[in-house]
Swiss-Prot record:
Substrate binds at residues 10-17, 23-24, 62, 89-92, 100, 116-117, 185-186. Its EC number is 5.4.2.11. Pfam families: His_Phos_1. This is 2,3-bisphosphoglycerate-dependent phosphoglycerate mutase. The record marks H184 as: Transition state stabilizer. It comes from Escherichia coli O139:H28 (strain E24377A / ETEC). GO terms for biological process: gluconeogenesis; glycolytic process. The active site is at H11 (tele-phosphohistidine intermediate), E89 (proton donor/acceptor). It is an enzyme of class 5 (isomerase).
Length: 250
């Protein structure tokens, strides 16, 4: 049976991950640790014999720079890359820039967990005159006002990620090309929920660690056979637990 593999990588730790702030569409860069995580992911993929034909990422530099570092370690800096806003992190609305633990102290752990992980729950909206509104950013100049979020739930994130998967990424994989996607915690959770047919309750508890290759294997009909991380299982579990704890009051 022919098996097709897909590699997903959540960007390495960003400066705002380090500061425990809601990031969303804010274009913050990787921390030093994040750069190291991305390089380590590339080294691990190289050790396991991976190489690629095409890469996808978002239009946010923490994902773009993660991909750069991964491909550099693979000696594939030349690889063709498509950047799409549809792979961006979920938009966190008026929470963007706020400290997660301080927000939990103000609103409670459960409310913040719902804002972070609830399927259909949206954080408080931005207003269009807010400097954080993506309509002020030239990289989104060609998007319609309807496409520009004031806030997003995971459900709304799925509404942009999955059509892009089905219409753009999957056809390339079906043509036989080997694909890597460098994206974000929630855009990748959106894809995992879809591929694994997860319930809303199951996806609530899924936390994807930064800078760790997440592997999928598909059968000849492109149905997922298995999903697993590359790397030390104990270290990965600890990183995932740390992601879960970010939204709790100190």
């Amino acid at each position: 049976m022919a098996v097709t593999k897909l590699v997903l990588v959540r960007h390495g730790e960003s400066q705002w991950n380090k500061e425990n702030r809601f990031t969303g569409w804010y274009d913050v860069d990787l921390s030093e640790k994040g750069v190291s995580e991305a390089k380590a992911a590339g080294k691990l993929l190289k050790e396991e014999g991976y190489s690629f034909d095409f890469a996808y990422t978002s239009v946010l530099k923490r994902a773009i720079h993660t991909l750069w570092n991964v491909l550099d370690e693979l000696d594939q800096a030349w690889l063709p890359v498509e950047k799409s806003w549809k792979l961006n992190e979920r938009h966190y609305g008026a929470l963007q820039g706020l400290n997660k633990a301080e927000t939990a102290e103000k609103y409670g752990d459960e409310q913040v967990k719902q804002w972070r992980r609830g399927f259909a729950v949206t954080p408080p909206e931005l207003t269009k005159d807010d400097e954080r509104y993506p309509g002020h950013d030239p990289r989104y100049a060609k998007l319609s006002e309807k496409e520009l979020p004031l806030t997003e739930s995971l459900a709304l994130t799925i509404d942009r990620v999955i059509p892009y998967w089905n219409e753009t990424i999957l056809p390339r994989m079906k043509s036989g090309e080997r694909v890597i996607i460098a994206a974000h915690g929630n855009s990748l959770r959106a894809l995992v929920k879809y591929l694994d047919n997860m319930s809303e309750e199951e996806i609530l508890e899924l936390n994807i660690p930064t800078g760790v290759p997440l592997m999928y294997e598909f059968d000849e009909n492109f149905k997922p056979l298995k999903r697993y991380y590359l790397g030390n299982a104990d270290e990965i579990a600890a990183k995932a637990a740390a992601v879960a704890n970010q939204g709790k009051a100190k």
